[in-house]
Amino acid sequence: MPKMKTKRAAAKRFKITGTGKVMRMRHARNHNRLKKAPRVRRSFDKMAPVHPSDVHRVKPLLPYAW
């Protein structure tokens, strides 16, 4: 059986933590950034967890991440 391919677009957008959580970058981080407060801009640099009800959509895209 051939190897499964990782979806490269998903690999660039999601990271898996050591405990198995799926992390994503926050939205609205580039466009009109200077209008936003500094505290909000700093929060864009942190990754946020993917909601547990959406993890099953990400798992098939990253077959070797787990």
UniProtKB/Swiss-Prot annotation:
Record keyword Disulfide bond present: no
Disulfide bonds: none
UniProt cross-references to Gene3D superfamilies, sorted A to Z: 4.10.410.60
Domain of life of the organism encoding this protein: Bacteria
Pfam families according to UniProt: Ribosomal_L35p
InterPro entries, per database record: Ribosomal_bL35, Ribosomal_bL35-like, Ribosomal_bL35_CS, Ribosomal_bL35_sf
Listed GO MF terms: structural constituent of ribosome
Keyword list, A-Z: Ribonucleoprotein, Ribosomal protein
Gene Ontology CC annotations of this record: cytosolic large ribosomal subunit
BP GO annotations: translation
PANTHER family from the UniProt entry: 54S RIBOSOMAL PROTEIN BL35M (PTHR33343), LARGE RIBOSOMAL SUBUNIT PROTEIN BL35M (PTHR33343:SF1)
Recorded family membership: Belongs to the bacterial ribosomal protein bL35 family.
Protein name, as recorded: Large ribosomal subunit protein bL35
Gene name of the record: rpmI
